[in-house]
Amino acid sequence: MAKRSLASLNAGDLSGKRVLVRVDFNVPLNDAGAITDDTRIRAALPTINDLIGKGAKVILSAHFGRPKGQVNDAMRLTPVAARLSELLGKPVAKTDSCIGPDAEAKVGAMADGDVVLLENVRFFAEEEKNEAGFAEKLAGLAEVYVNDAFGAAHRAHASTEGVTKFLKPAVAGFLMEKELQYLQGAVDEPKRPLAAIVGGSKVSSKIGVLEALIDKCDKVLIGGGMIFTFYKARGLSVGKSLVEEDKLELAKELEAKAKAKGVELLLPTDVVLADNFAPDANSQVADVTAIPDGWMGLDIGPDAVKVFQAALADCQTVIWNGPMGVFEFEKFATGTNAIATTLAELSAKGCCTIIGGGDSVAAVEKAGLAEKMSHISTGGGASLELLEGKVLPGVAALNDAA
């Protein structure tokens, strides 16, 4: 069921109203406490600017890091408020706490179009416990609720789920709406052929996604460290490569399931090997049937890249989650970069390309190709759970579209 969106509320509905907006401002900081990547802050601007334009009083709620329910000065949102103020070109007041006298006073002093950022909501243990009394206090600051934090939508926390019991309407912000439109659309009503590229080091972290995607896709391409568990399950020698011994049977089952469903499941035909796990390791390319002892696979090989490119050539929708190799090491980033380039080229031809959160987003940004993709998801765990077909509590709690 589609969710009600912020687009359904006009200036008449919002002017002078206090609107609580849950945003995802969990940005990386360097040792000096400066923001190194403001993508998540910029991603929330369309929603914030829309509310300012409609004369709302914009109260932002966010978490940062994992303070474990206690005040931690290193995890205050002060640098975020400063950066947001620069991006909006107007002052952003920050409260000392997300509830209590200071928050109430600053919200009470707001004029229409003002923006207040509540302090880190995870300074209270009640947030992650979704405690009703805490949710009611948070909701008490506002009259309308907007959830634009897709990256936290898979959590049933007070600021993502609990507050909706006390605030109506509860609607999706523009970022949340876009995420649902692309990710749910890709799974529920994709333009076919639909391919998924799944990478990363462990099968265990992607089991649910692989099972769900084999159900829905025409082609599933697997890369990253997890390929060696599949090879070992086939009886191949994998040298020192990463293998999850307890997942060998599962790898066999996934291959059998794909075969039974007529889904093309592709594993790399060759790999780039290293003699140790280091950026300057000695390397060689080997066929997957001839991996020598003492070597470990850190990237997909040049032949595998060609096979993957050929498989993707006719696809109309491609979902990518997880790198093809250890892309942090330049020597072993070739496979990942090649896939990023291929998807950028497919996008230009009208294919819908979706980068499903996590390391693949970092890889696409590192390759300078982020702008070329149809959609880059801001959620890691939330993207995976949505692709698995799970219900996200933060989404389920919003009002349904009329």
UniProtKB/Swiss-Prot annotation:
Subcellular location: Cytoplasm
Source organism: Synechococcus sp. (strain WH7803)
Major location (coarse): cytoplasm
PROSITE patterns assigned: PGLYCERATE_KINASE
Catalytic activity: (2R)-3-phosphoglycerate + ATP = (2R)-3-phospho-glyceroyl phosphate + ADP
Assembly and oligomerization: Monomer.
Protein name per its UniProtKB record: Phosphoglycerate kinase
Keyword annotations of the record: ATP-binding, Cytoplasm, Glycolysis, Kinase, Nucleotide-binding, Transferase
Binding residues for ATP: 206, 297, 328, 357-360
Stored HAMAP family: Phosphoglyc_kinase
Keyword Electron transport: no
Originating gene: pgk
